[in-house]
C-alpha cells in the first residue's frame, strides 16, 4: 500500500534530529514530503529557499524523500500532496501538549489526516534549531548537531554578527 506522509516544520535550520526523524519515517512510509513552512511570524534566520536547499542537501541520499516549501494551512498542503499522515517529532513532555492540540485541530480540519509521533534517538533528544542557532551565534561548534553544510551556512550567516564584535 502506497502511503505518503508529510513531515512539516520550519527547519531553521534542519538539524541532526530532523534528519534522523526523516530517515526513520522514510523507512516506515512509501514517500515522505518534507514540507518547509514559510513561517514569517517566527522570523526565520534562513529564507524559505535557503531552508529548502539545506534540507534537500541533507536528505539527498533518501530516494523516497522530497523537500518542498509551503505557506498557508498545513492541512491544505497535505491535501495538495494527497498525504494521509503527518509526521511529528516529540522530544519531551513539553512538546506533547502543543502537538496534541495541533493534532486535534488538524483532525477537525481534515478528518482523514492522521498524526504519527516519533521520538528522537537519545543522542538527538535535546537538539533544537533554536539551540543550534544560539551556539553558532556565539561561535560554538555545531558540527555534532547539524550536517556540515548546515554548519557552514550558519557560520556564513553569523560571520561578523557575533556579540562583542563590531
UniProtKB/Swiss-Prot annotation:
<keyword id="KW-0067">ATP-binding</keyword>
<comment type="similarity">
    <text>Belongs to the bacterial CoaD family.</text>
</comment>
<feature type="binding site">
    <location>
        <position position="88"/>
    </location>
    <ligand>
        <name>substrate</name>
    </ligand>
</feature>
<feature type="binding site">
    <location>
        <position position="18"/>
    </location>
    <ligand>
        <name>ATP</name>
    </ligand>
</feature>
<comment type="pathway">
    <text>Cofactor biosynthesis; coenzyme A biosynthesis; CoA from (R)-pantothenate: step 4/5.</text>
</comment>
<feature type="site" description="Transition state stabilizer">
    <location>
        <position position="18"/>
    </location>
</feature>
<feature type="binding site">
    <location>
        <position position="10"/>
    </location>
    <ligand>
        <name>substrate</name>
    </ligand>
</feature>
<protein>
    <recommendedName>
        <fullName>Phosphopantetheine adenylyltransferase</fullName>
        <ecNumber>2.7.7.3</ecNumber>
    </recommendedName>
</protein>
<keyword id="KW-0548">Nucleotidyltransferase</keyword>
<feature type="binding site">
    <location>
        <begin position="89"/>
        <end position="91"/>
    </location>
    <ligand>
        <name>ATP</name>
    </ligand>
</feature>
<feature type="binding site">
    <location>
        <begin position="10"/>
        <end position="11"/>
    </location>
    <ligand>
        <name>ATP</name>
    </ligand>
</feature>
<comment type="function">
    <text>Reversibly transfers an adenylyl group from ATP to 4'-phosphopantetheine, yielding dephospho-CoA (dPCoA) and pyrophosphate.</text>
</comment>
<feature type="binding site">
    <location>
        <begin position="124"/>
        <end position="130"/>
    </location>
    <ligand>
        <name>ATP</name>
    </ligand>
</feature>
<dbReference type="GO" id="GO:0004595">
    <property type="term" value="F:pantetheine-phosphate adenylyltransferase activity"/>
</dbReference>
<keyword id="KW-0963">Cytoplasm</keyword>
<keyword id="KW-0808">Transferase</keyword>
<keyword id="KW-0173">Coenzyme A biosynthesis</keyword>
<feature type="binding site">
    <location>
        <position position="99"/>
    </location>
    <ligand>
        <name>ATP</name>
    </ligand>
</feature>
<dbReference type="GO" id="GO:0005737">
    <property type="term" value="C:cytoplasm"/>
</dbReference>
<dbReference type="InterPro" id="IPR014729">
    <property type="entry name" value="Rossmann-like_a/b/a_fold"/>
</dbReference>
<keyword id="KW-0460">Magnesium</keyword>
<dbReference type="Pfam" id="PF01467">
    <property type="entry name" value="CTP_transf_like"/>
</dbReference>
<dbReference type="GO" id="GO:0015937">
    <property type="term" value="P:coenzyme A biosynthetic process"/>
</dbReference>
<feature type="binding site">
    <location>
        <position position="42"/>
    </location>
    <ligand>
        <name>substrate</name>
    </ligand>
</feature>
<dbReference type="InterPro" id="IPR004821">
    <property type="entry name" value="Cyt_trans-like"/>
</dbReference>
<keyword id="KW-0547">Nucleotide-binding</keyword>
<comment type="subunit">
    <text>Homohexamer.</text>
</comment>
<dbReference type="GO" id="GO:0005524">
    <property type="term" value="F:ATP binding"/>
</dbReference>
<feature type="binding site">
    <location>
        <position position="74"/>
    </location>
    <ligand>
        <name>substrate</name>
    </ligand>
</feature>
<dbReference type="InterPro" id="IPR001980">
    <property type="entry name" value="PPAT"/>
</dbReference>
Amino acid at each position: 500500500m502506497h502511503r505518503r506522509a508529510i513531515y512539516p516544520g520550519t527547519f531553521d535550520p534542519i538539524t541532526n534530529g530532523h534528519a534522523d526523524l526523516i530517515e526513520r519515517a522514510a523507512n516506515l512510509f512509501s514517500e515522505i514530503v518534507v514540507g518547509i513552512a514559510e513561517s514569517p511570524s517566527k522570523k526565520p534566520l534562513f529564507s524559505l529557499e535557503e531552508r529548502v536547499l539545506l534540507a534537500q542537501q541533507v536528505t539527498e541520499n533518501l530516494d523516497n524523500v522530497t523537500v518542498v516549501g509551503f505557506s498557508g494551512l498545513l492541512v491544505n498542503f497535505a491535501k495538495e500532496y494527497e498525504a494521509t499522515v503527518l509526521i511529528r517529532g516529540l522530544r519531551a513532555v513539553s512538546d506533547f501538549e502543543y502537538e496534541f492540540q495541533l493534532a486535534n485541530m488538524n483532525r477537525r480540519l481534515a478528518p482523514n489526516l492522521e498524526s504519527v509521533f516519533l521520538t528522537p534517538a537519545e543522542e538527538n533528544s535535546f537538539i533544537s534549531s533554536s539551540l543550534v542557532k544560539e551556539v553558532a551565534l556565539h561561535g560554538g561548534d555545531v558540527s555534532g548537531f547539524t550536517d556540515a553544510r548546515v554548519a557552514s551556512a550558519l557560520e556564513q550567516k553569523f560571520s561578523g554578527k557575533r556579540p562583542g564584535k563590531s
